[in-house]
Amino acid sequence: MDIFINRFPSIDLHGYDRDSARVRVMDFVTEALIMGEDGVVIVHGNGEGILKKEVHSFLKTDKRVKRFYVDAFNPGCTVVIFK
């Protein structure tokens, strides 16, 4: 667990539908890697978990992702660490 996640850039997906969120996350991850970031924070919210499931589904298949986890202090966020 990284208690200093505020050092990572973040994206807030509130208001996005599933498909738009997936595209936005793909672009955000690509941009972060180009900028040399070690990781990012994705804010998907709690709700019904639709965006969270979509984000995690994408992250599981992205070979650039070393690992990801739900933030212990805010379960509406996923922390992503790059390879």
Residue ranges, per PLM feature:
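Long, charged, low-complexity intrinsically disordered regions
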Residues: 1-83
